[in-house]
Amino acid sequence: MSNIHEHKILILDFGSQYTQLIARRIREIGVYCELWAWDVSEAQIKGFAPNGIILAGGPESVTADESPRAPEYVFNAGVPVLGICYGMQTMSEQLGGKVIEGIGEGEFGYAQIEIQEPSELFKSIEDAISESGKPLLDVWMSHGDKVLDIPEGFVTVANTETCPHAAMANEDKKFYGVQFHPEVTHTRQGKRMLEHFALDICECEANWKPTSIIEDAVERLKKQIGDDEVILGLSGGVDSSVVAMLLHRAIGDKLTCVFVDNGLLRLNEADQVMDMFGDHFGLNIVHVNAENRFLDAMKGEADPEAKRKIIGHVFVEIFDEESKKCKNAKWLAQGTIYPDVIESAGSATGKAHVIKSHHNVGGLPDDMELGLVEPLRELFKDEVRKIGLELGLPYDMLYRHPFPGPGLGVRVLGEVKKEYCDLLRLADAIFIEELHKAELYHKVSQAFTVFLPVRSVGVMGDGRKYDWVVSLRAVETIDFMTAHWAHLPYDFLGRVSNRIINEIDGISRVVYDISGKPPATIEWE
């Protein structure tokens, strides 16, 4: 079995919104990488022993006092270094070059760089040829400051009309700097540049692949758990489902899954989870029907944040009760993924703001005295999905749109009642069914229905009715940080509306949400 961690890249984060994207691109190339805060110690870098280091972008200005700098050891470690945007600027400043503050001369968005000197980073890459016969590349810029003088030993590899040093290189030391962002899709050949860096310049082997990751995870789980038993909260979501499949492969019947039906799931979801994991895959599952307990706990509560906390608290209570019944369980498995780890590590800066509290199993009681098993903690979401496919989970389940941890608890506005949840389940199922039929489901990033606790007059036959309102929501996004409302065809929306009003007794009006993010969030609560 190949060692999937033998060749690796270290990415130092200076605060750019694109930093995780760099890590995902390196992983897609087939090379393992980790993302650390910029102020790591020499000992930590030596301990990690990377084959190459990437200095990512950031919002600060290199010209400002006390702005972040790469550890000096980065440039003495004897490995290739790639500086991206802010990373190029701090590399330049730290190695003797000069960076000046941009005053109205920044570049934001599309730009075209002209390659002036050959470099391993840009080998055999071009989007067009200039009139002077030099390669041109379409790139994505996002910088105000710029490098005025490059350090000794470097050459200017590329420039734009307003940026004299859009890329620089010291081929002897294998140090490279690019002022643009190769990790974003707008830089058309960006992935090839990162491939050149990781595979050719750093000489990493591309052995970070789903089959290898599964083999490695199963082997490590067997070593960690031995003959002990494990308990897992299975929600039917992507992360917990993949954890369940990995553990089942590693330890078989020594895994007990606890599936809590909180009454806030999608239509028939509880049955689907039990059929798939219990009947089809043969996992040992305890099914807890706790609908009344959750609804009773939320009675009279309309505040979204309070509802989230109640749902999380009741789940923890139930899980604690069930875990005590598994007297031989020594380990608790969780679906923690790499962005969760990065978020936790990065929170020490104090710069992150809580927009919504996250529903996680992290609040389990300390007295559970169980060891923690987190087989996905090195993986991004797209990697988790690929592994799920390899483990035999169905595509439709793995690539379903995101569903919030509190479920319909935050899609019923205000107080949550069984009547509201039942109506919402039916309406949402019609919307999703029609999206699939029209082959629109995978063309939007997320689609769902929201229950509004307001009544509206409607006409059915010769009579009037005074029933509830639902809102359809569909968005298109790349990263869920920003989103556009999806321009679904009017005839499609009309069909969905007619079906919901005619087929569901209790709903008299359907509206469509045309709010972008920002200013609105994707979920209503």
Curated annotation (Swiss-Prot):
Task: Select a single GO molecular function from the record's annotations and give it.
Answer: ATP binding
Task: Please state every residue range assigned to the domain named GMPS ATP-PPase.
Answer: 208-400
What chemistry does it catalyse, as a reaction equation?
A: XMP + L-glutamine + ATP + H2O = GMP + L-glutamate + AMP + diphosphate + 2 H(+)
Q: Superkingdom of this entry's organism?
A: Bacteria
Q: Does the keyword Nucleotide-binding apply?
A: yes
Segments forming domain Glutamine amidotransferase type-1: 8-207
The annotated pathway is: Purine metabolism; GMP biosynthesis; GMP from XMP (L-Gln route): step 1/1
Q: Does the keyword Nucleotide-binding belong to this entry?
A: yes
For this UniProt record, give its keywords in alphabetical order, as a comma-separated list: ATP-binding, Glutamine amidotransferase, GMP biosynthesis, Ligase, Nucleotide-binding, Purine biosynthesis
Q: What do the Gene Ontology cellular component annotations say?
A: cytosol
Name the record gives this protein = GMP synthase [glutamine-hydrolyzing]
Q: Which species?
A: Shewanella sediminis (strain HAW-EB3)
- Name of encoding gene: guaA
